[in-house]
């Protein structure tokens, strides 16, 4: 008979493993945060909650929170950058109290590609790589553009109705539309915090100007004429000037609107008060635009707030004294310390220069629109002296084309050159439409083809050629020769010489 007895076992002293460890987590720019972590839980379980705690602590300290860059994962690492195993605990990886860890983002080294199973999937995949999708910002801008387009179309329909019917319907409807859109634009401007929000508000604000203008123009009773034009373009000018003053954005667009509205309002006012003829009004506007072309750079500088410094004397008496162009007195509110204005900083000068460029671009665009309208209206093929406006249009186009070379900004040079070409094209098209003869159509078609071809040849040759100072001076003289006959020809067209002769 066999007996089985259990062998006596020696007492084994149990070793207690720690339940939590206090470690220092390094994050941000030299920031160390002490945290209490579970010593026996897998590292992967604690990574995401630890990231939230670290980011909240960084925000409290005024530091930038940790953000992921691309595709990858967050990991706890040792001081040397070696990541801890996500499936093991801190105890299993010999991490104890007082150790330092580093939480960082590890980029994914694997490259994932989409499986293409059909040609439609390949087309969609290729298009998604080449073109950006519509995001919420673009969607809002598209919606605002659609609303602005609808407002403009509705205003145009109501204006057409007022042109044919002397009723108050246009005034009431456009006033209601203008007030509603203007209120929405003001609300968006007050709540705007980003450039995208301000862009949407600017779209709504510019669309609100048109119904307000049509409402003011349609208010005077009677057939549409100069009184309606005076009131409408006056409101348009004031509205654009207020938007320019209080928003400080879209300087070029608002400046163009102000120039066109102000000049048209003056012409309509002269027509209403003095019953001035159309030829006299258009010729006077042309001369005003020519003078404004000369004054545009100085006017844009003043609008931008740029003060020209005073040239110092030969004795340098202003080197250690206050510059005389700076103010010596200042007005402040009660309780505040007076601070005299000093020389502008580099940032202020750059900002003022950019504003001056925008103002100048708006001035050139507005003047170009007015010159094109005036010259096209003056060149009437059914008048007795139809050769005189044609000569005037030729000299005006030559002056503008050569004046464009004096501007540094290429868009401003293109504006002047484009204005000169559009004048010639518009006059030719009017002659072809009104004469309606085979000879006129043939000549106009030849001019419309040969003129851009000559411009393209000049554009391909002139920038690659270095000209002598004498040749440049000769081109400048040609510009002056084109400028000089404009005023005598315009006065001749207005019959000023005949009035002086037979007075």
Swiss-Prot record:
Pfam families on file: EccD, YukD
UniProt keyword annotations, A-Z: Cell inner membrane, Cell membrane, Membrane, Transmembrane, Transmembrane helix, Transport
Location relative to the cell: Cell inner membrane
The organism's place on the tree of life at top rank: Bacteria
Oligomeric form and interacting partners: Part of the ESX-5 / type VII secretion system (T7SS), which is composed of cytosolic and membrane components. The ESX-5 membrane complex is composed of EccB5, EccC5, EccD5 and EccE5.
Further facts: Was identified as a high-confidence drug target.
NCBIfam families linked to this entry: T7SS_EccD (TIGR03920)
Identification of the protein by name: ESX-5 secretion system protein EccD5
Species this chain originates from: Mycobacterium tuberculosis (strain ATCC 25618 / H37Rv)
